[in-house]
């Protein structure tokens, strides 16, 4: 099936844009949602996470203690690689399954770290980047998550640069001070293009 890889930095509006495509019939496969599912109580990744990191990283309800894990992997690259070695194969298997079962005319992989992960770029026929200025990202995440400016800047520093994302893009949606109608118009135009690409690829 024809596949779009949708990405963007934290606070760019990826989820909003993905939902607009979903409302138009695209089949969404969201790696963040899958990551949350496999680290929820009884999730597929939890036994291996507990074995690798200890019971202290499991919350009382049996889910991953996200705040504790976030603190660890932010300062420990080896711990991040250990976590990714557990979660990435499971996320890959789940995304493959969801893509195979997708009923829509095309599938849209929603992948925050698509540019940083070469295999996601290879799995997508086109890469769509949701773009906005860094200052807009910072303001949105501070407002949405209650993070300090320093916390948001640290997250952004761990992600691909805005320039690297734009260089990887086949298509770009600008979501800065865009009105909802203007954003929807950008989505409508690309959705029609993607329907054409998907039909030609069948």
Swiss-Prot record:
EC number annotated for this UniProt entry: 2.7.1.24
Pfam families linked: CoaE
GO biological process, one term: coenzyme A biosynthetic process
Zinc as UniProt keyword: no
Domain called DPCK: residue spans: 3-201
Gene3D superfamilies: P-loop containing nucleotide triphosphate hydrolases
GO cellular component assignments: cytoplasm
EC category name: transferase
Entry GO MF terms: ATP binding; dephospho-CoA kinase activity
Keyword Aminoacyl-tRNA synthetase: no
Swiss-Prot/TrEMBL catalytic activity: 3'-dephospho-CoA + ATP = ADP + CoA + H(+)
Predominant place of localization: cytoplasm
Pathway annotation: Cofactor biosynthesis; coenzyme A biosynthesis; CoA from (R)-pantothenate: step 5/5
Purpose of the protein: Catalyzes the phosphorylation of the 3'-hydroxyl group of dephosphocoenzyme A to form coenzyme A.
Matches recorded under NCBIfam families: dephospho-CoA kinase
PANTHER family to which the protein is assigned, alphabetical: BIFUNCTIONAL COENZYME A SYNTHASE-RELATED, DEPHOSPHO-COA KINASE-RELATED
Family listed: Belongs to the CoaE family.
Designated name of the protein: Dephospho-CoA kinase
Organism in which the protein naturally occurs: Burkholderia lata (strain ATCC 17760 / DSM 23089 / LMG 22485 / NCIMB 9086 / R18194 / 383)
Lineage, opening ranks: Bacteria, Pseudomonadati, Pseudomonadota, Betaproteobacteria, Burkholderiales
């Amino acid at each position: 099936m024809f596949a779009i890889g949708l990405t963007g930095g934290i606070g760019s509006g990826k989820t909003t844009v993905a939902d607009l495509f979903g409302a138009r019939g695209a089949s969404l496969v969201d790696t963040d949602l899958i990551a949350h599912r496999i680290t929820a109580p009884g999730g597929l990744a939890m036994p291996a996470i507990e074995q690798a990191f200890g019971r202290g990283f499991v919350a009382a309800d049996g889910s991953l203690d996200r705040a504790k894990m976030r603190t660890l992997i932010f300062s420990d690259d080896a711990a991040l690689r250990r976590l990714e070695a557990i979660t990435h194969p499971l996320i890959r298997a789940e995304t493959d399954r969801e893509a195979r079962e997708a009923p829509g005319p095309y599938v849209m992989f929603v992948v925050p770290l698509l540019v940083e992960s070469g295999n996601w770029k290879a799995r997508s026929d086109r890469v769509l980047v949701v773009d906005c200025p860094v200052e807009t990202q910072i303001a949105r995440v501070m407002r949405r998550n209650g993070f300090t400016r320093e916390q948001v800047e640290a997250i952004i520093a761990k992600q691909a640069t805005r320039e690297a994302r734009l260089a990887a893009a086949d298509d770009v949606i600008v979501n800065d001070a865009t009105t909802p109608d203007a954003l929807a118009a950008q989505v409508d135009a690309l959705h029609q293009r993607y329907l054409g690409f998907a039909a030609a690829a069948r």
